[in-house]
């Protein structure tokens, strides 16, 4: 009860503290509150909850995920990464239109999502390859972050090159991706 009250507090610092407290606990008892908080207009809190739920995606309601994934910002991109394959198929047209978004997070997350259900999709592959071509360190690092759970979309050779890239930002992001691979 106390944690739930803290999560529902009007103080962002208390809410973030409560999110930190529950990170290693079973979260089902706070599911309703966490979903409600995801619909607030606080991107810091939304991001922390999404990162907390990354390996426990079942605590986030499908309707909330769809709503979040419609945002044109980093929160929307994180929401896209949570979508199950059947949701990606349902949202395919919108995600396909997002591939050329000016928001790097939305474009990268949408490209990866489309490639999860259509590995041969040329437009999504072209866009992802553009990100991985390291013309812009930030864009490449962002794209790598969205490949964490889809590392099969990245060849071993390219991952190895990115691990040894002179940019710390890129090599760190590549290391995060490689930690998810089994090959």
PLM-predicted stretches and their roles:
Residues 2-6, 27-39, 58-69, 88-100, ...:
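Amphipathic alpha-helical scaffolding segments comprising HEAT/armadillo-like alpha-solenoid repeats
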Residues 4-61, 74:
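Membrane-proximal soluble helical/coiled-coil segments
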Residues 10-11, 41-43, 71-73, 102-104, ...:
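Short inter-helical turns and helix N-cap capping residues of alpha-solenoid HEAT/ARM repeat scaffolds
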Residues 22-25, 52-59, 83-86, 114-118, ...:
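Residue-level signature of the C-terminal ends
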Residues 107, 112-156, 169:
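Solenoidal tandem-repeat scaffolds enriched in leucines and small polar residues
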Residues 167, 174-183:
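Short, intrinsically disordered, charge-balanced linker/junction segments flanking boundaries
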